Swiss-Prot record:
Alphabetized GO MF terms: RNA binding
UniProt keyword annotation of Transferase present: no
Basic and acidic residues bias spans: 74-85
UniProtKB keywords: RNA-binding
Chain spans, region Disordered: 74-103
Residue ranges constituting the RRM domain according to the UniProt record: 2-79
InterPro entries: Nucleotide-bd_a/b_plait_sf (IPR012677), RBD_domain_sf (IPR035979), RRM_dom (IPR000504), SLIRP/GR-RBP-like (IPR052462)
Pfam families: RRM_1
Protein name: Putative RNA-binding protein RbpB
């Protein structure tokens, strides 16, 4: 399971984020999505810790904490399928049904 880290400074690096979370245990992976057009960090990231206990400790300590001039939003990351409706399938299914009903 991963940790979602939001409201990050655009100056953050994977190394600096790793250092903050390393205070709460072993960091397995840090991911900072980048904007395709600008190449700039998008203001959020994901951190994977060594154990659930380490994740819980990091979330409890860092959620709402100020870092690099920003108040962090830190919680368990939701799997892609649980984050809400996907954009692609919603419109596609509806148009196929309308086509069948008309002809």
């Amino acid at each position: 399971m991963s940790i979602y880290v939001g409201n990050l400074s655009y100056d953050v690096t994977e190394e600096s984020l790793n250092a903050v979370f390393a205070e709460y245990g072993s960091v397995k992976r840090v991911q900072l999505p980048v904007d395709r057009e600008t190449g700039r960090v998008r203001g959020f990231g994901f951190v994977e810790m060594g154990s659930d206990a380490e994740e819980t400790a990091a979330i409890e300590a860092l959620d709402g904490a100020e870092w690099m001039g920003r108040d962090l939003k830190v919680n368990k990351a939701k799997p892609r399928e649980d984050r809400g409706g996907s954009r692609g399938s919603f419109g596609g299914n509806r148009s196929n049904n309308n086509f069948r009903n008309r002809y």
